[in-house]
Amino acid sequence: MTEDKKVSVSMFIKELELEVVHKGENTDYEIISSDINRPALQFAGFFEHFAYDRVQVIGKGEHDYFGTLDRATRLRRLEKLFSYEIPVLVLARGLDFSSDTINMAKKYNRIIIRSQMSTTKFINKASGYLSEKLAPSKTVHGVLVDIYGIGVLLMGKSGVGKSETALELVKRGHRLVADDAVEIRRIEDDMLVGEAPDILKYLMEIRGVGILDIKNLYGVGAIRTNKVVEMVAELEYWEEGKYYDRLGIDEEYMTLLDVPVEKIVIPVKPGRNLAMIIEVAAKNYRQKNMGYNAAKIFNEKLLKKLSD
């Protein structure tokens, strides 16, 4: 299930350690976009297509330009600016707000804050923070493991052996990211990042044994806090008569948060070393990304042999 994310201005101020210049009592707004707006055009009097729902940042350029306007014009522009429900107005570089700006913020019950950082650094930091917090997300049932630098999401029905396979992978030197519940965020158009909920971080459940703390049992080298999800390995009980891919020519994909992720289906039956199979699958995935596809090369050789 996907979630619509919002960040309160109070949390934004706290996390980025910003100075509050004015914030009315019982006043808070929610930030819904990671994009930042610099209201230079608005200070010049152009309010068409004004992205008022974004964090508004004033740098030295806007600050100095605004100071060249006569007071009557400044008041009109401020009145117009604050008449929109902007979430917050930020002044970078430690610059000062004029008394007119503060009074107008009080009139419209808006929040104004200050950062000591340069404008560019503040925008980069604020945008990165908001992108992470506002990224589309969902929680899936599975186990996420870092195998040779490839984020592999193990999925399948409950009891099929996902956690046991992940434990064997950890013993083989790979790193656990999340067990049972994986929180996945789309931080870019085609990039998914998975992590464990705080309450489950570094923990694993093994039936018959109970809860294991992987960090304490195997050390910090056996865990990581998050990982890009690059491949899905779905474990399913072996079904006699069902076709399973034996060549690996046809690639299958699973869509997560509108992002296609390469998927392989691994049939589970006694005697199969699932950890080793998934380990090899991760190596093969990396090899294909480097331009070498063993299945396609074999197929080309076979077709050439048949045509001779």
Curated annotation (Swiss-Prot):
Enzyme class: transferase
GO BP terms in the entry: regulation of carbohydrate metabolic process
Chain segments carrying region Important for the catalytic mechanism of both phosphorylation and dephosphorylation: 204-213
EC number(s) stated in the UniProt entry for this protein: 2.7.11.-, 2.7.4.-
UniProt keyword NAD present: no
Catalytic reaction annotation: [HPr protein]-L-serine + ATP = [HPr protein]-O-phospho-L-serine + ADP + H(+); [HPr protein]-O-phospho-L-serine + phosphate + H(+) = [HPr protein]-L-serine + diphosphate
Keyword set includes Chaperone: no
Protein name: HPr kinase/phosphorylase
